[in-house]
Amino acid sequence: MKHYKVYQIDSFTRTKLRGNPAGVVSNANGLNEAQMQQIARELNNSETAFIFTPEKSADYDVEVRFFTPTAEVPICGHATIAAHYVRAIQGTHTQGRALQKTKAGILAIDTLRQNGDFAIQMTQATPKIKPPLDKNVVSKITRALGISESDLREDCHVCEASTGHGKVMIGIKDLHLLHSLTPNMSALASISAQIQCNGFYVFTLDENDEFLAHGRMFAPAIGINEDPVTGNANGPLGAYLVYYGICKGLQNGDEFSFFIKQGEAIGREGQMQVRVSIKNGKPALVQIIGEAVVAFETEIVL
């Protein structure tokens, strides 16, 4: 029998019970895949992170695996923030860079000191932007969201963007409409099976607001009807905006940095900063920065 330390972390916020909750098991060595899936199902967060200490000869500092209540996923933004926030408050890694092994590759994570607490910067995987989706598929998506195609922004192609875990980018014109969406989740799940992409990120843009983007992310195909605040949607959003030259006036030379807000419609408001490094006019590197707070901690004996 072993005692496993379990944290409930609210990511992308400093306020408990806001932002995006993630489970973190900080000493996961010894757990098998079935046990990790059972723990993730028991905690019932959108994702739970399992932290493994590697062998000393490894070319990375820490391994983290991510499970939804129903399946393992390659990477998760808010659970990465949560996992490294736990490592910081435990004193394992309190400042500077660590290399994190994931199913999406080895990624750089930076622990920062901000206002007497910690913030976590996640360098995401190489951005990839796929071609716009077929018009028939776009029509299915808008019907599933309960909107018309005239609600879509003309400058925003509906396509998949990824920095490790792809999302369909759907830019719409109106913030009130965004907050009032009530999607047909079974229809979205069917579309996911068709296009082999599990997440739909609906967003608005306002270049004159403190928060450039507001968004909502739906992923019913993997058991997440709505994710409150999504690192692996907003990082790809930054790459997508650079790729298509949207909000180009806000770019500062070879860098594009902005803040987003998400989760307002479901009472889990959170925010993050997105940074995109630009090379030859295209997104080359994407980073997100988020805060976190401990909601509670406990242990499980297995």
Regions inferred by a protein language model and the residue ranges of each:
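N-terminal, positively charged, Ser/Thr/Ala/Gly-biased leader segments
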Residues: 1-18, 147-150
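Short glycine/proline-enriched turns and hinge-like loops at secondary-structure junctions
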Residues: 17-20, 76-77, 112, 211-212, ...
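Gly/Ser/Thr-rich beta-alpha loop segments that engage phosphate groups in nucleotides
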Residues: 21, 25, 79, 166, ...
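Acidic/His- and Gly-rich active-site-bordering loop/insert found
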Residues: 22, 26-36, 40-62, 66-68, ...
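Short hydrophobic alpha-helical segments that form membrane-spanning helices or hydrophobic packing faces
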Residues: 23-27, 84-85, 171, 237-239
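Acidic, low-complexity central loop/insert segments
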Residues: 38, 60, 67-192, 242-302
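Conserved phosphate-donor
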Residues: 45-63, 187-223, 257-279
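Short glycine/threonine-rich catalytic loop with a Thr-x-Gly-x-Asp
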Residues: 73-76, 224-238
